[in-house]
Amino acid sequence: MIVTVTPNPSIDRTIEIDRLERGGLNRARRSTAEAAGKGVNVSCALALHGVATVAVLPLARDSASTYLRLLADAIPIAAVPIAGSIRTNVSVVEADGTLTKLNEPGPTLTSEDVDAILVAASGVPAASWVVGCGSLPPGAPVDFYARLAARASPGRRVAIDTSSEALGAAVCAGAALIKPNLDELETLVGRPLRTLGDAAAAARELIARGCRAVLVSLGPDGALFVDASAMSHAEARIDDVANTVGAGDALLAGFLAAGGDAGGLGDAVAWSIAAIRSPGTRMRAVTAADRAPVIVHERIDPARRLRS
């Protein structure tokens, strides 16, 4: 069982256009809306592939019915009722793949809401992983994910995918796994990371601060996994990119589904490929065609330039 925690869920609207004209009228070719949020996306990807999961999330009363209708029983949820409305995130996707995102802040959580979410997450039985994902809404303390990690009972590993101060706090709280992207990793260590060796050294630095393993999403350069005893890099060259929204969530879901260690890196990248070949936030099932281009390097090339 993998429990996800999404403190700031969203309704994700994806609008496809030919080309964005700032200040002009833009006509959509296609528009979709999905119940989302990073942890919800992870749970949906896991459930699609037969992995037991429960998504813990605050459910704002004013838009709860819309969110549940869009979710359509895709995953079991443990909802914490709160006041307000669920935020809407808009992704504008141009024909050449350019993505422009507009994200609302989300409803304000009270301290009681925060406590209720943490209690709900720790109350799901038989969980091997508890996965905290996404931005923090107004009212949530910066140590929200650190508190989530501190509450983990023996036998439950905690993975965190967030950014900024909240991610730094989770590192110091001893999370079993953190999943930054390259920009987030640079922010955590306070310097630019231009090569794969730079990224690996930064990951080692975070492990020295307290977390046990680091999974770095590198965009077109694939993904890097580092723990105290292993280091590996996986990549794939593909041309048919439909949408990069949700690719990092799929990467994390695939990694955890494959066991949450170095041996799962190839699967993680394959799941990410399936996501970027899928329109909208929700990924389709992984196929042999998604696995075929994945190359796993057990020994990394430290001189390799990133952002290729």
Where in the sequence are the language-model features?
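Gly/Ala-rich phosphate-binding loop of Rossmann-like dinucleotide-binding domains
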Residues: A47, S153, G260
